[in-house]
Structure formats: C-alpha cells, structure tokens
Regions:
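N-terminal polybasic/positive-inside topogenic patches
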Residues: 3-18
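Generic detector of N-terminal low-structure segments
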Residues: 4, 21, 31-34
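Short, Lys/Arg-enriched N-terminal segments with co-localized hydrophobic residues
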Residues: 18-24
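Bacterial N-terminal signal peptides that target proteins for export
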Residues: 26-39
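C-terminal motif of bacterial Sec signal peptides marking the signal peptidase cleavage site
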Residues: 46-48
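Bacterial signal peptide processing site
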Residues: 50-52
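Alpha-solenoid helical repeat scaffolds
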Residues: 58-78, 86-620
Length: 620
C-alpha cells in the first residue's frame, strides 16, 4: 500500500508526464554539486584540504578551537565516522572562517547529517551572504528540511549574485536583447544574449541540485517565489513549467507554458510543457493539437513529442504508427526502436518488448537500461534464474543498485537470505557514498519479505548515523504499518506532519494510512486535501482521496475519483482500488475489465492480485 507514498516522495523520478529536460536535470552534476558526490570524494577532499588552506590564506585568523576541531573531524572521516566528522566540523564552523564553514557544509551534506549541515550552512551564508555556492547549498539543505521560506530567500540571493555578475560584464538578465538605437555597436546585444544564456544555465544547474536533495513540490514553491516576480524570458517560464509538471500541478504548468509562448510562440520546450500539461489535466484534444504544433516547429523532436503524448493518453497504436512514420522520415533509427520497446513494455506486450530490447543490444545501440528491462521481463515471465543471471551482468554497471536490489528480492523469494543481503553489502563496501540508499533498500526488502523487525532495526541504526533524517523516519513509519504496528506508524507520521506541515508526501501518507484502517476519516480526508492543494494532479494523492471516499461509503463517487487517479498514473494498486469501488457499486463487469487491463500491465502486483482474490475467491 505504501508503494504509492514512496512514489509521491519520488515524484520527480516518474517520467511519464513531464519532459526529458527535468529528467536530465537529475543526472547533471552542476559546479557546486561536484564536491558532494559521496563519501569517496569527501575523503579525497579532506585529504587535500590542508594544502588548499595553505594555498588560500584565511580571511581572518582561524580560532584555535576551530582548527583543532577541524583536525579531529578529518580524523573522524578517515576512520569512517561520518557522524563524528559532521558534528565536529559543524562545531568548528561556529568559530571558523569561510573555508571551514564551506568544508563543514559539504562534509555534512555528503554524510547526510542534516542538523550538522544546516548549522554549518547557516554559518557559511552568514560569513559569505553573496556567495553563490553558499546560497545554493543553503537552499538545498533548507528544502530537504522543508524550510521553504529560508530556501526562497537563499535563491533570491543566488539570483542577485547572478545579476551582479552580469552587471560587472556590462549587462544584466532581463536587459532588452536588441539596441533601440540603429547602427549601435553589435557587442552589447551579443553580450546580453550570452549573459541570458549563462543565467538560464545557472538556474538550471541550481534546479538540478535542489531536485537532487528535495521533492519537486518544495522546489517549485521556493523557485517560483524567487523567480516568478521578475521573470521575463521564455526559458524561465519553461523551467517553472517543467517544475510544475514534476510537482503534478498541471494548471500551473499550463499557465507557465502559455506565458513562455506569449514571449516566443515557436519555443519548442514551452510547447512540450504545454502538451504534457494538457495530458495531466485530461484534455486530450488540446494535448494532441499542441504536440502537432511542436511537430510543425521541428519534425523530428516534435514528432517524438507527439508519440509520447499519444502513449501517455493510452493511444498506443497511434503512438506506434507515429514512431514508424518518424523512422520513414529519417529520424534516428535507434531512438525510434528504443521508444517502440518502451511503448511495448508499458503496454504489457512483453514479447515485442523483449524482441526490440534484444535487437537494440545486438545492434550496439542498447545500454545498461535496456539490459535491465530484459532482466525485468525475464522475472515477470516467471524465469527467476534467467532474471538473476541477467541482473548479475549489471552488478557493476550504471544501474548496479537497481539490478542488485531486484536480484536480492528474487533470492529472498526463494529464501536465499544470506546471498541476497550479500549483494547489497558487497556493493556498500565498494560504494560507501551510497550507504544510506543501500540501507533504505535493504530495510524495504526485508520488510517486503516478512522481516519487518529486521528492517526496523536497520533503520534505527541508520538514524544513529543520520539523525533526524526525513527519509529514514518516513520509511520507518512505512515499515511500522507493514508490521501491523499501525498506531506507532500514525504517531510517527503525525510527528513528521508537525515538523513538515506543508509536505504533501507526509500529509498524504498519514491521510492514506488513517483511511486504509478506517480511522478518523474526516481528519484523513482533510490531510489528503491539504496534500492535493500542493500537488493537485498527483496520482497517489488522488488515489488516497478516492480511497477515503470509498471508506466513507461513497463507492460510486470514489470510482470516479479513482478512475481519474489511474489516468494520471497507471499504478496497479490504484487499479485495485478503482476496481473494488466499481465492484461494490454494482459495476462488476467494469471492475473485471479494469483489473484485467491492469494485470496485463503488472501481472505480479501483490495488492492487485490480493484484491481480486478477496472479491473473487475462485479467480485464477
């Protein structure tokens, strides 16, 4: 059941309804993120920090206690005590200079010690209020703690620093890009355009960092508050539109895209945002018409966008035809084949998907993701040995954590516990920078295979290393519910709501948990509606609303809400809820149709199969 809550927490990773631009943001390493890429980098960074400080004299004499604490922190880090290093560096920062505060912030962020990171970042920003990097990391930590007002202030300061850089170059973002004086020298307009491009790139990199550390709704709240009042370029409005799509707010995305198109009616990125906003809002005719406008603007890129929109609208045959037309028109064959493989996979046609992914690999155009799909297809087709063998080939690839986690799940299914956990432990030994993600993955795996207590024990240990970490606290609440400790789960989520009252993930999780156990239904509905106010088109939150309506006895009304939720995100658990609402309201034939279609997409969904078995005991 909490798969939905996990999906809400990771909304920016769901790529069906927003453009590739935001998906690429998550993979980009912006300049002020390069030193945060994990434990191994921190060790190297600290090893060289003495020489760095020698080369760059401090702006003020370093307090003796700060220097001593910094030395202790380095020793902590080198012997693997990330918490000790974070806390000692944070203490050093309180009396240290800018360099110490910067180092303290980076170490604590890499160690996922949020209280220490927040303490150090506040100090750094107070010492260097106009430093772009200080403001960027301050905003990232603030958003991770759901301090959106503080994040917005730092983003404003970041943007002012951008303006100062451009002013120093003789121009500023927003300056008209053509001279009102005929025959004026060409240099200023060129410089202005270059400055605008640099500012856009810089804000894209900041957005990438913020999305890496927080959820899209929080990033949208902070970024829009900082950028929207003075926005005057298509790029800025398109960026905000992308964020609105990632935050599942179709109406805001539509508005931003339309404002971008008022400035440049031919802007392809804005047309893509607008088309997907219409998809999210359920306006299929406008979505297709807008995608065709994009196709008229750029036959290949716009043509791919049209295929994507058709696929999102469940018009798979038309999407298939569109992709074949692109092939005939000279579009890159490998890209056409990749999209056809994904289309087949998402439509439940595993035979075609397997064939196309295999052909991609044979032609040399495949990648690790294609191999991962083939392994997933083998697992889905009931061939665990073949799937494990395929996952094994990816154990040291770019998708290693996914491959190892899925192989571990299959091994746990056959009670090979030691071998399963070794897959993750071995990877952790070689990749300590991913320790937290690995711990969370292991705890979820154990809980999903009947070992909730073991998963909770892992999370308790993780909280000692990463105190007050919201991801650990959230997963702990999830697993408490799985273990049947519902009241403890509710208490944990209530504490998180008190700390993060506008976080839609936590609001929805608490509301859904109460509804699923028929507890405090009016309160549950209120919580879910608060989540929907922030992320109105999120399928998980819309599903929760439908489920609380069902629990309140309105099966027919719930069916309509759940149908909308399923149109937003084809999650099998939403289909289970939708079918049950239809069944109870007397529409058994329609319920069977919904379940059959969902099973074709996700034949191994435990919630879906459990619902069908409960309502149709003799179903096979």
């Amino acid at each position: 059941m909490f798969a939905l809550c996990d999906k809400l927490r990771n909304a920016q990773a769901a790529g069906t309804l927003y453009s590739d631009k935001v998906m690429r943001m998550d993979r980009r390493i912006c300049p002020f993120l390069r030193t945060l890429r994990g434990w191994a980098l921190v060790v190297g960074l600290l090893a060289g920090c003495a020489s760095e400080h020698a080369a760059k004299p401090a702006s003020a004499p370093l307090h003796r206690d700060a220097a001593a604490l910094a030395v202790i922190a380095e020793a902590d880090l080198k012997r693997g005590d990330c918490r000790g290093a974070s806390e000692n560096y944070a203490r050093a920062a309180t009396a240290g200079d800018v360099q110490v505060a910067r180092q303290a912030t980076q170490v604590a962020m890499a160690c996922e010690h949020l209280p220490a990171a927040w303490q150090a970042a506040q100090r750094w920003r107070s010492l260097a209020p106009n430093d772009r990097e200080a403001n960027a990391l301050y905003a990232a930590i603030a958003l991770k703690l759901y301090r959106t007002a503080e994040a917005r202030a730092a983003i404003n300061d970041f943007w002012r620093a951008e303006e100062q850089l451009d002013a120093a170059a003789g121009t500023a973002p927003g300056t008209p890009q053509s001279s009102p004086v005929p025959d004026a020298a060409a240099a200023p307009p060129v410089l202005t355009a270059r400055a605008q491009q640099r500012a856009t790139r810089s804000m894209g990199e900041l957005t990438a960092l913020l999305l890496e550390e927080s959820d899209a709704p929080a990033v949208l709240t902070a970024m829009s508050g900082a950028l929207e009042p003075t926005a005057n370029s298509p790029d800025t409005f398109t960026l905000l539109g992308e964020l609105a799509l990632a935050a599942y707010d179709g109406q805001r995305a539509q508005g931003y895209a339309q404002r971008a198109l008022q400035l440049d009616p031919q802007d392809l990125a804005a047309l893509r945002v607008l088309a997907r906003a219409y998809v999210m809002r359920g306006d299929a005719p406008q979505a297709v018409a807008t995608a065709r406008r994009a196709q008229a603007r750029d036959a290949t890129r716009g043509g791919f966008e049209l295929a994507e929109v058709l696929a999102s609208l469940d018009r798979s045959e038309e999407a298939h035809q569109q992709l074949e037309q692109l092939r005939a028109g000279g579009a890159p064959q490998a890209e056409v084949d990749r999209r056809l493989a994904l289309l087949a996979c998402n439509s439940g046609d595993m035979k075609e998907a397997r064939q196309r992914f295999t052909e991609l690999l044979a032609s040399g155009e495949g990648n690790d993701a294609a191999q991962l799909y083939l392994a997933d297809i083998a697992a889905r087709d009931g061939d665990p040995d073949g799937a494990i063998a395929a996952y094994r080939r990816l154990y040291d690839s770019s998708v290693a954590l996914s491959a190892r986690s899925r192989a571990a799940a299959l091994l746990l299914d056959r009670s090979a516990r030691t071998e399963a956990l070794a897959l993750l432990d071995d990877y952790a030994a070689d990749h300590p920078e991913e320790e937290l993600d690995l711990t969370l993955a292991k705890a979820r795996l154990l809980a999903d295979h009947g070992e909730a207590d073991a998963g909770l024990a892992l999370l308790s240990t993780a909280l000692e290393r990463h105190p007050q970490h919201p991801s650990i606290e959230y997963d702990r609440a999830v697993i408490l519910e799985q273990a049947g400790r519902v009241h403890e789960s509710v208490e944990a989520l209530e504490r998180m709501v008190n700390e993060r009252p506008d976080d839609p993930t936590v609001l929805n999780a608490l509301g859904y948990t109460l509804a699923d156990h028929t507890l405090e239904l009016p309160h549950a509905e209120g919580l879910i509606r608060r989540a929907l106010a922030v992320t109105p088109d999120n399928p998980a939150a819309v599903d929760s609303l439908g489920w609380v309506q069902f629990r309140q006895g309105d099966a027919r009304g719930a069916a309509g809400t759940l149908a909308h939720a399923y149109s937003l995100g084809h999650d099998p658990e939403i289909a289970a809820h939708w079918g049950e609402a239809l069944w109870v309201s007397g529409q058994q034939a329609e319920a069977r149709r919904v379940w059959a279609a969902a099973l074709a997409r996700d034949p191994d969904s435990k919630p879906l199969k459990a619902t069908i078995k409960r309502l149709i005991p003799d179903a096979h």
